[in-house]
Amino acid sequence: MAMSPAAPLSVTELLLVSAVFCLVFWAVRASRPKVPKGLKRLPGPWGWPLLGHLLTLGKNPHVALARLSRRYGDVFQIRLGSTPVVVLSGLDTIKQALVRQGDDFKGRPDLYSSSFITEGQSMTFSPDSGPVWAARRRLAQDSLKSFSIASNPASSSSCYLEEHVSQEAENLIGRFQELMAAVGRFDPYSQLVVSAARVIGAMCFGRRFPQGSEEMLDVVRNSSKFVETASSGSPVDFFPILRYLPNRPLQRFKDFNQRFLRFLQKTVREHYEDFDRNSIQDITGALFKHSEKNSKANSGLIPQEKIVNLVNDIFGAGFDTITTALSWSLMYLVTNPRRQRKIQEELDAVVGRARQPRLSDRPQLPYLEAFILELFRHTSFVPFTIPHSTTRDTTLNGFHIPKECCIFINQWQINHDPQLWGDPEEFRPERFLTADGAAINKPLSEKVTLFGLGKRRCIGETLARWEVFLFLAILLQRLEFSVPPGVPVDLTPIYGLTMKHPRCEHVQARPRFSDQ
């Protein structure tokens, strides 16, 4: 039976459709913030109703937004749900925003996921950016410096960090050798995350956690639950309905933060019970002493109950970033055996076999340093900073950006910008060496962006760079890493706050010298 053709719309229906269209168009235009005279409106693609540009971001938002920057420029706007988000790309533009106009861009958006990190009191994630926040940040930075990269008069090591990493690297080599003897292969990530946690634990609490501590293992081995949800563009932060629907990643994120906070609260409480005010040996002790001093002065800068919040930020950053960097390093080494041998030849020539590498060897090991810089650039495993927000109406590159606007900083785009690097997809450590290969090209090395910039720059950046260097130097002096012939190594990054690679359980480590 033939279907009759659809009847044409009546004049009334056409008028109604036109009226609805005009109303929607007017509402969209009216919702756009007014731009002061002489300034430009933010460019950007049209998004879907309700969803905005969520589908555009896909599984790799850093790549999708870098692609959009080629069309719309270094400053453009997208929408996630109904929330406008300004995306910044380009090294010069990002430096202008975060360094030269740092006060305008130092805020944090009030994101739903951040409310679960130390119960919304995280110095790193919370929206607070006022004088008290700045003072606490300086205090955390000074305490971290004092018990990591500052000299330790009671040790033969150059600093606390060198002492802790040297000891932990020896333990790590022993664990790798035990696993090789038992099963002939291992997953390096599961071992590295424990070592990194033990090092930052020693700096925070003056002691390394026992190797088999179930509490510590439960926390650090589930840290991936955190980076899944805390990443830029997490849907739960921009689509409120997702908070009320079954959401396994969100529930895992909440559970992890609760366990992590309980673990640190218990550890900080135990540490306070045997705290010696006359002999400060760690970060938490320094914070206790400062808290008591300011309590007597009634300044209230850091009441004792807030100490765990600062320790949470320092401890959390101190093991995830390090673990991720070291794990990526081993994956690149087993897939680049020629470069691994070149690093080892440099270590043999400079350090030899009779002693461990030390931090003072860094200037004489430029190829290892170049490898680390190129690893940071090529993986860009921190693709975005934690989102920023504007603290007041401001202007950037001639564009008007209103107060309390969410800002995404695309670090991945900087590190893969052909104008900066020429061949960004090539892994080539030599690009960071001077013409004679004897030193690092400092101006070029400073363009690698992984730890943020300006007033929100990662307070543990120096610690991270030194720790990654020392771990790799000690491991590569003693061991040769490989995978069996024919075993594929997947280097596809998995998007998150820090991007991980798929786990590889077939890494092997063999002693380089017969007398080991």
UniProtKB/Swiss-Prot annotation:
GO terms for molecular function: estrogen 16-alpha-hydroxylase activity; estrogen 2-hydroxylase activity; heme binding; hydroperoxy icosatetraenoate dehydratase activity; iron ion binding; steroid 17-alpha-monooxygenase activity. Heme binds at C458. Its main location: endoplasmic reticulum. It is a peripheral membrane protein. It catalyses: an organic molecule + reduced [NADPH--hemoprotein reductase] + O2 = an alcohol + oxidized [NADPH--hemoprotein reductase] + H2O + H(+); 17beta-estradiol + reduced [NADPH--hemoprotein reductase] + O2 = 2-hydroxy-17beta-estradiol + oxidized [NADPH--hemoprotein reductase] + H2O + H(+); 17beta-estradiol + reduced [NADPH--hemoprotein reductase] + O2 = 4-hydroxy-17beta-estradiol + oxidized [NADPH--hemoprotein reductase] + H2O + H(+); estrone + reduced [NADPH--hemoprotein reductase] + O2 = 2-hydroxyestrone + oxidized [NADPH--hemoprotein reductase] + H2O + H(+). Its EC number is 1.14.14.1, 4.2.1.152. The keyword Iron applies. It comes from the Eukaryota. Substrate binds at F226, D361, R362, P363, Q364, L365. GO terms for cellular component: endoplasmic reticulum membrane. Keywords: Endoplasmic reticulum, Fatty acid metabolism, Glycoprotein, Heme, Iron, Lipid metabolism, Lyase, Membrane, Metal-binding, Microsome, Monooxygenase, Oxidoreductase, Steroid metabolism, Sterol metabolism. GO terms for biological process: arachidonate metabolic process; cholesterol metabolic process; estrogen metabolic process; hormone biosynthetic process; progesterone metabolic process; retinol metabolic process. PANTHER family: CYTOCHROME P450 1A (PTHR24289:SF21), STEROID 17-ALPHA-HYDROXYLASE/17,20 LYASE (PTHR24289). A cytochrome P450 monooxygenase involved in the metabolism of various endogenous substrates, including fatty acids, steroid hormones and vitamins. Mechanistically, uses molecular oxygen inserting one oxygen atom into a substrate, and reducing the second into a water molecule, with two electrons provided by NADPH via cytochrome P450 reductase (NADPH--hemoprotein reductase). Catalyzes the hydroxylation of carbon-hydrogen bonds. Exhibits high catalytic activity for the formation of hydroxyestrogens from estrone (E1) and 17beta-estradiol (E2), namely 2-hydroxy E1 and E2. Belongs to the cytochrome P450 family. Interacts with PGRMC1; the interaction requires PGRMC1 homodimerization. This is Cytochrome P450 1A2.
